[in-house]
Amino acid sequence: MTRVLTALVLAAGLAIPTAAAAQPSLKNPASLTEKAPATYKVRLDTSSGPVVIQVTRDWAPLGADRFYNLVKHGFYDGVRFFRVIPGFMAQGGMNGDPAIQKIWGRNNINDDPVKQSNKRGFVTFAKTGAPNSRSTQIFINYANNANLDAQGFAPFGEVISGMEVVDKFEAYKNVPDQGLITAEGNAYLQRDYPKLTFIKKATIEK
């Protein structure tokens, strides 16, 4: 389990484009600071099926705001869940365009206090062992991972529809290399791990 938890620390198939065309706004993280609503829903249309996440801002305000802005500006479109460990969690959130990932991978937000436990279906930003190291990667808990709470992993939302879809995400476990994802983006993942579940489109539901 120690090895699995350590792997949560970040180095921060269909014929589809290797990366979604980035919106110009994604090149300027400083402009994407809109405050999220108190609650909102995000629909992930994935290659495995639809998943709906309900976000509660009070649980983790900074995380909820970051997720809201990234979804609104198309960051997660085309993104793969590159690390899926059955019984633990499914992790994704590295942009398929290396230039965009380079910008956001070093644009961290401060930590939120942990108000909710990492229960099955809860959605959380990944982080390193250092303070204030959350950027864009998120994970969905497959199990009740309360041991993550004391490590500062603060859930900001939960899957309210489609958890059975999440359970079917393609699992290559720890095989994909985050360094190569950073360097090559979706081109690397599509070439070497073509069955990875990916987000076709992430949208904020009205």
Q: Where in this protein do the model-derived segments appear?
A:
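Cyclophilin-like peptidyl-prolyl cis-trans isomerases
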Residues: 13, 19-206
